[in-house]
């Protein structure tokens, strides 16, 4: 089985050093910087049709802008109600200053 890595963004397109808007939206996924590392999740909340790229990132937690549920962006784990389902995460690597995502 071959690996399916896609070029998601330039590394410098994922904002650094701010408490909000750490995320970068690319179609159906969302990129985040946490402590210098890049993480990727689906861009749609598992609870409702809210875009995670419109949420608020604090540390490792992204808060859904619709119902304030929070996910750990590093693991995808749903951390509080009303969330009952984890969010999908994607493996990330940096190649030639490009953020690459491994899709299933």
From Swiss-Prot:
Domain Rieske residues, every copy: 5-101
Region (Disordered): 1-21
UniProt cross-references to SUPFAM superfamilies, sorted A to Z: ISP domain
Signal peptide: none
Cofactor binding mode and count: Binds 1 [2Fe-2S] cluster per subunit.
Required co-factors: [2Fe-2S] cluster
GO BP terms in the entry: catabolic process
GO molecular function: 2 iron, 2 sulfur cluster binding; metal ion binding
Subunit note: The 2,4-dinitrotoluene dioxygenase (DNTDO) multicomponent enzyme system is composed of an electron transfer component and a dioxygenase component (iron sulfur protein (ISP)). The electron transfer component is composed of a ferredoxin reductase (DntAa) and a ferredoxin (DntAb), and the dioxygenase component is formed of a large alpha subunit (DntAc) and a small beta subunit (DntAd).
Family: Belongs to the bacterial ring-hydroxylating dioxygenase ferredoxin component family.
Name the UniProt record assigns to this protein: 2,4-dinitrotoluene dioxygenase system, ferredoxin component
Species this protein is from: Burkholderia sp. (strain RASC)
Organism lineage string: Bacteria, Pseudomonadati, Pseudomonadota, Betaproteobacteria, Burkholderiales
